[in-house]
Regions:
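Active-site residues of response regulator receiver
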Residues: 9, 55, 84
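The feature encodes the CheY-like receiver
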Residues: 14, 59, 88
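Short hydrophobic/Thr-rich beta-strand motif most characteristic of the beta2 strand and flanking loop
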Residues: 27-35, 43
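Acidic catalytic/metal-coordinating carboxylates
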Residues: 36-39, 62-65
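The short loop immediately C-terminal to the conserved phospho-acceptor aspartate in CheY-like receiver
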Residues: 50, 56-57, 82
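Short amphipathic alpha-helix used as the core "switch/output" element in two-component signaling
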Residues: 64-76
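Alpha4 helix (beta4-alpha4-beta5 surface) of REC/receiver domains from two-component response regulators
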Residues: 65, 86-104, 108-116
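A short, hydrophobic beta-strand element within the central beta-sheet of small alpha/beta folds
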Residues: 77-87
Length: 125
């Protein structure tokens, strides 16, 4: 089974970098990208992804609020990973508060971290 991934970030260079990480990770495929929190909620409903890579700081509603909205309206279980340039100690707890499965600093986002986070989150389903 291929994991359907949606990338949410307002910075095009990071969306491109995240796409490269996802596409080089076996069993993962990018199905869509969004630039704002509002757009991510609409697109998640339309595309029905398995996994959302969500930036914390977004124009309009922020990543944690968009995460809550996506989880409230999802048709099935969606795993959301929060990503940001902030340190894990600062934002790790916020990930849990909004329902995200994990927080990954952008500086350590890699195919290995993606696969590990997905495995951990999907094993608790």
């Amino acid at each position: 089974m291929t994991v359907r991934v949606m990338i949410v970030d307002d910075q095009a260079p990071f969306r491109l970098a995240a796409r490269m990480v996802v596409e080089t990770t076996d069993g993962f495929d990018v199905v869509g990208e969004a630039e704002t929190g509002e757009q991510s909620v609409e697109l998640a409903h339309e595309l029905d992804p398995d996994l959302v890579l969500m930036d914390v700081n977004l124009p309009g509603i922020d990543g944690p609020e968009a995460t809550r909205k996506i989880l409230e309206t999802a048709n099935h279980r969606v795993v959301i990973l929060l990503l940001s340039t902030y340190e894990e100690a600062e934002y790790g707890p916020r990930a849990a508060e909004c329902g995200a499965a994990a927080y990954i600093p952008k500086s350590s986002f890699s195919p290995e971290r993606l696969a590990e986070a997905w495995a951990a989150a999907s094993s608790t389903a």
